[in-house]
């Protein structure tokens, strides 16, 4: 193997060096503290699991993003987690088994078999929060508000929100009696806003049903879209009206809390259609071609773990937040240089300083004082009149 091959990393996998790593860790700690103030308890999930457990309740998209290997101990397939959300749902449904609302949060590395988009990392640091046990729009408003607080904490500029509801399309498709194949093809066409394809696929339906499905491709824009949707979908089934009412209630609450926040509605936005069951939302910023934070309601996932629970939540990537946000550089690394000595009184002084929060770097055999600056030290310990004292570093 050539020397150059020994330090090459797989595509989409990167090292994080000290200055950037320090910024990421500062933001991670700030976000977990923020979650704690909102009542969310921190959990840590395994990096690898048996595939059956890891993909339970998840859609095909997660299966495709999961890197799989054979466990040498059991011979079974195991996967590296590509999304922490299903793992946290299992903790709520199977491990904790609490009654009533349960708020959980997490932060950890995930691994994707393929990057989410061109030139993106395959090893993001996923940060998120989940609220279980409440099916009301108030829970969706809470997690969206918390997501916006996260973006505000790191000063991500010019954020705008996309909102949709998969229950609207699902209700219309169910009422139309579409086959699984046609429903999937129509879903794909709506995602691409391919109006001509939508018309062809709905041509065999009764006029009223076809018109409502075709309208979804055009129902995108500002707050006025919701009023237009109420008119276009007046003949829709009750479940569609319930979904639209939920979306309106959430939009109204966000408008009160964040009157300056641009809200964009897209009723054919079906991100996570096979996974989500209600409102879906995402935050975008100009110049970035994909969402920087996203989430939605996924009430069905708990059933796969033996206990169906309403659930809603969001996730984001810490690396992206630090890159896009206005995060202050880490404080300059300073410290105290201690000489290479076996003096027990020096050792006691070093330990006392460290317990007080000081950074103390002990010289190794053969190191000279000029290594102190390279070690980030601006002071040193000197023996004066039989006492070890902290003095400015003099080179």
UniProtKB/Swiss-Prot annotation:
Subcellular location: Cytoplasm
Keyword list, A-Z: Amino-acid biosynthesis, Cytoplasm, Histidine biosynthesis
Main location: cytoplasm
Cellular component GO terms, alphabetical: cytoplasm
InterPro entries named in the record: aa-tRNA-synth_II/BPL/LPL (IPR045864), HisRS-like_core (IPR041715), HisRS/HisZ (IPR004516), HisZ (IPR004517)
UniProt keyword Cytoplasm present: yes
Pathways per UniProt: Amino-acid biosynthesis; L-histidine biosynthesis; L-histidine from 5-phospho-alpha-D-ribose 1-diphosphate: step 1/9
Family as reported in the entry's similarity comment: Belongs to the class-II aminoacyl-tRNA synthetase family. HisZ subfamily.
HAMAP family to which the protein is assigned, alphabetical: HisZ (MF_00125)
Miscellaneous field: This function is generally fulfilled by the C-terminal part of HisG, which is missing in some bacteria such as this one.
Subunit note: Heteromultimer composed of HisG and HisZ subunits.
Protein name: ATP phosphoribosyltransferase regulatory subunit
Gene: hisZ
